[in-house]
Amino acid sequence: MYTPPLARLIEQLQRLPGVGPKTAQRLALHILKRPENEIQALASALIEAKKKVGLCNVCFHFSADPICEICRNPNRDKQTICVVADSRDVIALEKTREYKGRYHVLGGVMSPMDGIGPEQLYIQPLVRRVTQDGVKEVILAISPTVEGETTTLYIGQLLKPFTKVTRIAFGLPMGGDLEYADEVTLARALEGRRELD
């Protein structure tokens, strides 16, 4: 049905999150119709991003520098850390323009079924930041899935002896993801955060 190069392109596109067979086919056919210089620019951008974008040494958000812009910004509140599962959550919260503190990206959530425990996440660096940097509040902004709740409770118990721990209020249904929430919902969730019991 497809020539081998087209079949390989479709197969690789299907590896992207949210891209099924039909979308992969549509994208592949679109790519083939574009001028070669546009395809070269796309390929170059992919390779450059992979080579130059890593993780911030402080918060583990994506960064082209050893320390990201948010962590370097002297106007950000150093005494407040918002803990999120993924860099997409940082981007979603930043769009609200409500939060003025710093972040900590865990790199996922605890999921015993998938073999992801506390050791596979950036939890120990968070504990070090809290205990060494005089952090006054940790805001847990993790999606309210079963795994997210497990992670929230674990981190809350771990950090309570050292600082105030709150979690954002959710105007989201259980099982929802932060990245799909609108800015108003996220802003209200930040405003309505509460201390963990």
From Swiss-Prot:
Residues 79-173 form the Toprim domain. CDD domains: H3TH_StructSpec-5'-nucleases, TOPRIM_recR. Gene3D superfamilies: 3.40.1360.10, 6.10.250.240, RecR Domain 1. GO terms for biological process: DNA recombination; DNA repair. Signal peptide: none annotated. GO terms for molecular function: DNA binding; zinc ion binding. It holds the Pfam family RecR_ZnF. May play a role in DNA repair. It seems to be involved in an RecBC-independent recombinational process of DNA repair. It may act with RecF and RecO. Belongs to the RecR family. This is Recombination protein RecR.
